[in-house]
Structure formats: structure tokens, C-alpha cells
Regions:
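Canonical helix-turn-helix DNA-binding module
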Residues: 42-86
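Basic, amphipathic "hinge/linker" alpha-helix immediately C-terminal to the N-terminal HTH DNA-binding motif
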Residues: 79-100
């Protein structure tokens, strides 16, 4: 039972961190992780994004749409197969993820003392 309580505390800590992250960057953790994935791999399909983030295809589609609406990623049509769709960071998306990666997160609370 003690392990279950620790898992609950980890879940709460992540939820608190995400709330602060959203306030700071106007991005959910999944949106931030999508930007990180595209920084590491500049051209990914929606299926590759789903696999990289461990999301269902349905959730990935919603996530992509949300980040596209924020103009942080762009669609690229495949050169060989015009039916193939790739996603990459826009200049604004690159700027955003570099800001996120270089900022110190000491101001965002992750209450590890409960773990």
C-alpha cells in the first residue's frame, strides 16, 4: 500500500508541475514533449510522433492540431509520396523549445520531499 501512496504523490507532483508549466509556457507537457521530439528528429509522421510520445493515434491527432494552431509546428507533404504527411518545428516552435530547454526549472515546484 505504501507504494500506491508514493505513486499517488508522484502523480500529484506531475500534475502540479504541469499546471505551472502551462502557466509559464502556455503548453501542456505533451505539447512540450512533441516539440522536444521534433527537435531531436526534425521530420516525423503522426505515427512516429505517437510512438515517440506513447500516445494513441487519436490523442496524437488532437495534440498535433493544438500545437499547429499555436503555429509551433508545420505540415510538410512528402516529396516521394504526396499522401505522406510530415511535421516539423516552425521558427517560432524552435524558439519556444530552446527557451524551454535553457530555462532553469527551480521556480517550478516538484515536491519530491513527499516521495
Amino acid at each position: 500500500m505504501e507504494d500506491l501512496c508514493k505513486i499517488r504523490d508522484v502523480y500529484r507532483a506531475i500534475a502540479e508541475f504541469e499546471t505551472q508549466f502551462i502557466q509559464q509556457y502556455n503548453l501542456s507537457l505533451n505539447e512540450g514533449m512533441l516539440l522536444c521530439a521534433l527537435l531531436d528528429n526534425p521530420r516525423l509522421t503522426s505515427g512516429e510522433i505517437a510512438e515517440a510520445l506513447g500516445l494513441t493515434h487519436s490523442n496524437t491527432s488532437k495534440l498535433i492540431r493544438s500545437v499547429e494552431e499555436k503555429k509551433l509546428i508545420a505540415r510538410i507533404i512528402g516529396k516521394v509520396d504526396k499522401r505522406q504527411m510530415y511535421f516539423s518545428l516552425t521558427a517560432e516552435g524552435k524558439e519556444q523549445i530552446h527557451t524551454i530547454k535553457t530555462v532553469s526549472y527551480t521556480h517550478l515546484t516538484l515536491p519530491t520531499n513527499r516521495l
